[in-house]
Each structure stands twice: as C-alpha cells, then as structure tokens.
C-alpha cells in the first residue's frame, strides 16, 4: 500500500495540481514532444508522493488526454512529469478478427511502477506511433509475450501475461518511464508520416511490402 512509510511531497503535489489545471475544463493537457529533456529522464518510483485526491485527478486527466489525442497509452513523462506512472486502454474494433497484430481488449489501467520481461523469444515487427513523436510511425520489433507487473492506485501489485498488441502497448509505455522513445530501436528506414502510412502501407499490417520498398529488414 502506498503511504505506509512515506509522506506526501507537498511541493510536488502543488506542481502536479498546477499541471492538471493546464488541461482546463476539458481535462486535455498539452503533450510533450520529442526533444524535451523530460522524455529522456529516468522517472522516480511512485511511493505515495501525491495525495490520493491529486493522484486520482491526475490519472483521470491523463486518461482524458490520451483518449482525446487519440491514443492507447500515455506516460507521465509525456505530460512533463517524471513519475513512474502511465495509463493504457485499447478496445477491439469490429473487423479486427484475424489481424496479425493480434489486437485484444485492453481495459483501462493506471500502471504505476510498471516493469516487464519477455516470455519466450518470439518477436513481432509492426508499425507503431507515439503521441510525443506526433505525425509519424515506424516499424518496431517487440516481444510477442511478456510478463507485465505494475501497481494500481491503491498500491496493490499485479502480474499478468500479456500477448500481442496489449503487450506492445505495455512495453511502449513502460519504456517511456526509462527515458526511451520507440524510435530509438525502430527500423529508421521505415519512418513514415501518418498520411503516407495510410496511402501506401495500411493494407499490409505485416510490413513486408514496406520493407521491400523502403529498404529495411523484418
């Protein structure tokens, strides 16, 4: 449980309250873009530094910001906050059956102090994007199956086997909290604008045609 051996950091709590207010009535906060130092910093583990009221407001505002963007994950660093906290949520669309990306329902979670480790050695390479590298996507190889670990808002510990697209989302957001952007290990020759992805490559979820035409390996 959070707070058992810790006290609220009053200064940090005030800073976070100010940050939340940048979202206005709509609760949509500005998203930090690549090049800002906070995205490259190792985050601080969360251990009750915020009041529960402030933590709940932060998580709610992060979720609204994520969904409005729209996105399926948002790390605290992406709103300029160096705490080990992210939100994730994704829902399967009609017609997704058979998609090689293996999308699956991923209900909303606030993931605090998350970590993961691969299960097995299988990887998959697909296009992915980032709200902090807006307007672009690139092919990134990631583990197909992971053991995901995190704490919830109450400090309860969770461990779950994630597979396919939910595993990719969890890896992406957890990496943010260690100062990593997906582009760091992406196939750089695959980099494309969202518009060009839609025009040229969206019919090929496994990017074999893009690999051949743009000159990268899967």
UniProtKB/Swiss-Prot annotation:
Keywords: Hydrolase, Iron, Metal-binding, Protein biosynthesis. Fe cation binds at residues 130, 172, 176. NCBIfam families: PRK00150.1-3. It comes from the Bacteria. Removes the formyl group from the N-terminal Met of newly synthesized proteins. Requires at least a dipeptide for an efficient rate of reaction. N-terminal L-methionine is a prerequisite for activity but the enzyme has broad specificity at other positions. Binds 1 Fe(2+) ion. GO terms for biological process: co-translational protein modification; translation. GO terms for molecular function: metal ion binding; peptide deformylase activity. This is Peptide deformylase. Gene3D superfamilies: Peptide deformylase. PANTHER family: PEPTIDE DEFORMYLASE (PTHR10458), PEPTIDE DEFORMYLASE, MITOCHONDRIAL (PTHR10458:SF2). Its EC number is 3.5.1.88. It holds the Pfam family Pep_deformylase. Transmembrane segments: none annotated. Belongs to the polypeptide deformylase family. It catalyses: N-terminal N-formyl-L-methionyl-[peptide] + H2O = N-terminal L-methionyl-[peptide] + formate. Its cofactor is Fe(2+). The active site is at residue 173. Coiled coil: none annotated.
